[in-house]
Amino acid sequence: MTRMVQCVRLGREAEGLPRPPYPGELGKRIYENVSKEAWQEWLRHQTMLINEYRLTPVEPRARQFLEKEMENFFFGDGSSAPPDYQPE
């Protein structure tokens, strides 16, 4: 049976994630409140952030930045693209 969540990003009930996608309390919060569809949106947005800011995800500062952006994306005012970002 598919697990459903009230997705904070989409504002509606949708299919939930199969397991927490991130460690710790933030991962648990995402698991309980974010749908698969919204998680896929985040992955696309995160890829854009990594590319545009030329981040190296294994570096602690980059991980901290991405974690903050992830929390804003789902539970804050959102995460925006860099000022000069031009989608293709």
Curated annotation (Swiss-Prot):
Keywords assigned by UniProt, alphabetized: Iron
Output one GO MF annotation.
iron ion binding
| A single GO BP | cellular response to oxidative stress
Q: Which Pfam families match?
A: Iron_traffic
InterPro entries hit by this protein: Fe_traffick_prot_YggX (IPR007457), Fe_traffick_prot_YggX_sf (IPR036766)
Q: Which family does it belong to?
A: Belongs to the Fe(2+)-trafficking protein family.
The task this protein performs is described as: Could be a mediator in iron transactions between iron acquisition and iron-requiring processes, such as synthesis and/or repair of Fe-S clusters in biosynthetic enzymes.
Q: What is this protein called?
A: Probable Fe(2+)-trafficking protein
